[in-house]
Amino acid sequence: MITNKVKTLILVNLGGPRTPSEIEVFLRDLFSDPFVFDLPLPEFLRLRLARFIAKKRAPKVQKSYESMGFGGGSPLVEETAKQAHALELALNERSSEQWNVKVAMACGYPNMRDIEFGKPNQDTVYLPLYPQFSRSTVLSTLAILETKFGECPVGSGGYVPHFGLDPNFHSISAKFIYEFFTNQLPKDQYLHYPEEKPNCDWRNLDLVFSAHGVPMRLIHKGDRYMEEVELSVKGIADELSKFGFNGGVHISYQSKVGPAKWTEPSTIQMISSLAKQGKHIAVYPISFVSDHLETLEEIGEQFKDLTWEMGGKSFVRIPALGIYPSFIQFLAEKVMHSDRKIQHCICREKGGESLQHCRFKD
């Protein structure tokens, strides 16, 4: 039975331009973030440089968005909204309280800095859709909320921590991959659903877990992102073995921007190497739970073309989890328990530093 009390869940994602007119704004927000674009420059110079880079990159990025067939924008906001709707239904089925689920983005619109998104507490809960902790995603989100409300939300009861190390997430992801290869997923629920399948037994192919890369300077600052990715992959691979999978398991990093050193090996390097050996290749987006430019265009088109060019025998893109029912129920369970048990600074533990207004700061 649902009571009159209404609780709000705010589903946070990185963001993406919904239309071509939002591309430069999205890029400006992205490169203005000190946890993403963290060059040792005075603030006014860093922001000026961020605006310059956004303006310069916008035309090139626009061509990539145009190629996806979503009106020149990214489907990420809409895909996140689908997850929000599914999660709202799941929460209201499980809870005696009424839940209203909103979508907010760290970059672009709807922007989580807007007034409609309230202070984190037990009645207003924030759930960032980042499986693994990184300074550039989770810590960035927490810093935005800290700037807005004057305190870090960790420990407030209104924040759901990253979930990529949870054994339940591993088993759900493994079953999702199994159901994809055995044609059990509803195709109409996934964008550009990959119709092609490897012309070999899926249990013997080479499975590449591709994560979004980050600059190595973040790792050197204490970001344990690579460790989290590796543990996520190990957990999923162990679960996949229960479905008979005994092929190759590989970790790589995609979406590098600029000349600085990033996490390696790159997915381009990994796929090139495997394809030259004549391998059957599948790519799973380990750090993404919503399909967008990096999964549909970069993995689905660019990496596929690279596989054929380098002599690979087959290539398949595995979709992101999206509204996979078990995943939505998993998130609902996380939301209902929130982070009331957290009694330490996860930012320092996972990202190398505490925020200024951390409630657990020594």
Curated annotation (Swiss-Prot):
Reaction catalysed by this enzyme: heme b + 2 H(+) = protoporphyrin IX + Fe(2+)
Signal sequence, start to end: none
Enzyme category, top tier: lyase
Cell compartments where the protein resides: Cytoplasm
GO molecular function: ferrochelatase activity; metal ion binding
GO CC annotation: cytoplasm
Any one Pfam family match given in the protein's UniProt record, by short name: Ferrochelatase
Keywords: Cytoplasm, Heme biosynthesis, Iron, Lyase, Metal-binding, Porphyrin biosynthesis
Residues engaged in binding Fe cation: H212, E294
Parts forming coiled coils: none
Family: Belongs to the ferrochelatase family.
Record-given protein name: Ferrochelatase
Source organism: Leptospira biflexa serovar Patoc (strain Patoc 1 / ATCC 23582 / Paris)
Lineage, uppermost ranks: Bacteria, Pseudomonadati, Spirochaetota, Spirochaetia, Leptospirales
